[in-house]
Structures are given as structure tokens and as C-alpha cells.
Amino acid sequence: MRPIINVSGTMTALGASIIVPEAISAMAEIASQWVEMDDLQRAASTVVARLTGGEAGFITACCASGITMAIAGAMTGTSLLAIERLPDDTGDLKSEVVIQLGHIVNYGAPIDQSIRVAGAKVVPAGTVSVTQDYHVREAINERTAAGLYVVAHHTVQYGMLSLEEFCEICHAKGVPVIVDAASEYDLRGFLARGADVVIYSGHKFLSGPTSGIVTGRKDLVRAAYLQNRGVARAMKVGKESIAGTMAALEAWEKRDHAGIRRREEAALNLWKDALQGLPGILAKIIPDPTANPLDRLQIFVSPESRFTAAGLASALAAGSPPIIVRNHEVERGHFFLDPCNLHPGEAEIVAERLRAVLTAKDRPADAMKAARKDSSGVLKWPD
């Protein structure tokens, strides 16, 4: 196992987060204790509700499981028999979920699979680049259990209905709205804007253990929680993750956000200065696409650098320690550096490596490689 420098972000494939000390302590403290899990989740509900403005909440294994549980809950309500019969036997249940086509993303797995695991049918609304109000309105019928709205940099960032518009249409037809806000900093805004249930990550910006946070209307949260007696049994969360996430939520309240922001800005400026004047390289500090309070460095790579964006990203990852960049748009000739997950001294290492790789006389063999979606390495695990 090799240590890496993460300038990609809070990615599950890279370990999700650097857990804050408060969460580590809470996890260690509860690890050797017996607890009644429903009571622990009741305590978590109080913390989640206070910080999000929801009526109730609970902790689950991750956001993907939270989506499945919330959708299943919208289908079954509190019918324990219906809960046991999912996902195959939906009977007379409402079992369709409306989602804008531009929101059907892959976050490591396709989001529509999280819907289907609940036993629900995915009903796409609109086109990849445009959703009109009538697309959603006409997709809703007597079988619709919920509308799912995704807030993420992965979604199409133009032409989609706003959350307010989506909620207005769904609510006019008596359909609850579930929001996937895994990476979002705003713990209160989505419920305030009309969502009925919101799902957050406990391990991304909160820096807790791998977990999901479900919050919102009490009846829907209760129905989602009861899925632990059904499809969510395979997604169960441990006491350590519940305690750690509660601690991370409370630590978030007290965190020096202004100080963290200053450190992130210093790293971005350091990297931008390191790239100044290098042939074929243009660096710009840009805001987060979903309006989280953070910036990233976007690095444009042209042939004059004797690299492609994919080739430069590969060269940084090939060093020691590997530097893993945010490369989800690398085929467009650029990638990003995210400053949010650095240990002390790592920003300087990144700056030095960037300069060294780009000023070296020779280039690696794959410097000009094209971006490819190659899954062959995945299929070789664990070799």
C-alpha cells in the first residue's frame, strides 16, 4: 500500500476523507461498548435535526444506501410487510421515481442502480441537456413514489430545472422530493428550498467516517429508517460510524472555516505561481461548480507543453509519492487541483513536482497519450 498526495478531492476511491480527531475519539470510545442501536440512532437524529433543520434524521452506511433507503421508504411507508417484500414484490405500491435525465450520473456506480435496488423503476424526464417543466409534470402519475434531485458536479450544469421548480411540480401532484447532496456543504439550504428528504455524506466535507446522513420530514425519515428491516440490512452501519459521524457534525459547527479557507487559498496561489510562464500551461483559480465555499486550480494543457492533460496527470501519479489529480474532465484538455485534503507540507511538494515534471528535458513515454476509459486494470483486482 503506497501513501499518496490527494489533490483530487474527497473521493471514495482514495479513502474518502481525513477523519477529524473528534470523530476518531468518539469511534474509539464506543468501539468497546454495547449499545442499543435504535437508541444511538435516536441520539443521532437529535444531532442531525439540529444541524440540518430537519424534523428527524439518521446515519447510514453511505449516501448510496441513503438514496436506496429514502426511495424504499417513499414506496412502503411504515408497512413492515411491504418492507420485507422489497425489492421484487412491489405489489400495489407506488414504485416509480422521476429524475431529470441530466441527473442520471455515475459516482462510482450508476445512481439509477441505487433506485432499482429499492425495487423502484427509474423514469427519466427531459433530455440530456434540457428539462422543461412539462417533462417532469407529464412523467408523474399515480405510480410515482418520489422525485430524485441530484446536486453534484457530475450533473449537467445547464438546462436543468432548479430545485425550487422541481419541488413545485412534484409537490403539486403530492410527490415527495429526495435530494442527493453528497458533496454539499450547505446542511440547511436544500430542506429550506423545498426538499422533503436530503442525503449528505458524512465523510466528505464533514471529515467523518464513511457514512451517509438522511434528514428531513419525520414520516419519510422514519419510513427510510425502517428499511433496516429489509433491503437496507445489507447496508447496515456500525455503532462506530454513527458515533463518529455525530462527532464530525458537531465538530463542523466549531471548525475554523475562515482559517481553512485561507490555507486552501495559499495552496492554490502557490501552485498557480509555480506554473507561471511554463510553455503550454495555463492555470486559473475557479469556484466550485455547485457553489460550495471552495476554489480549485484548473490547469489547461496544450501541445506546446509536450504533454496532454492525461499525460501530465499520469506523470504526476507516477512519481513518489504519487500525486492524484482531479481528472474527470481530462479528455477536454484540463484537470484540477483540489486543496481541501492536504497534510502539512504537501502543497509545497505538489508545487515542486509540477515544476520539475514540466521543466524536465525529457518526457515520459506516455506524455502525449490520449484520455481513454480503460477498465482493464479494474478487472485484474486483487492481482
Swiss-Prot record:
Keyword presence, Metal-binding: no
GO molecular function terms noted in the UniProt entry: L-seryl-tRNA(Sec) selenium transferase activity
Highest taxon listed in the record's lineage: Bacteria
Keywords: Pyridoxal phosphate
Cofactor section: pyridoxal 5'-phosphate
N6-(pyridoxal phosphate)lysine: residues carrying this PTM: K204
Annotated family: Belongs to the SelA family.
Name this protein carries in UniProt: Uncharacterized protein mlr3804
Organism the protein comes from: Mesorhizobium japonicum (strain LMG 29417 / CECT 9101 / MAFF 303099)
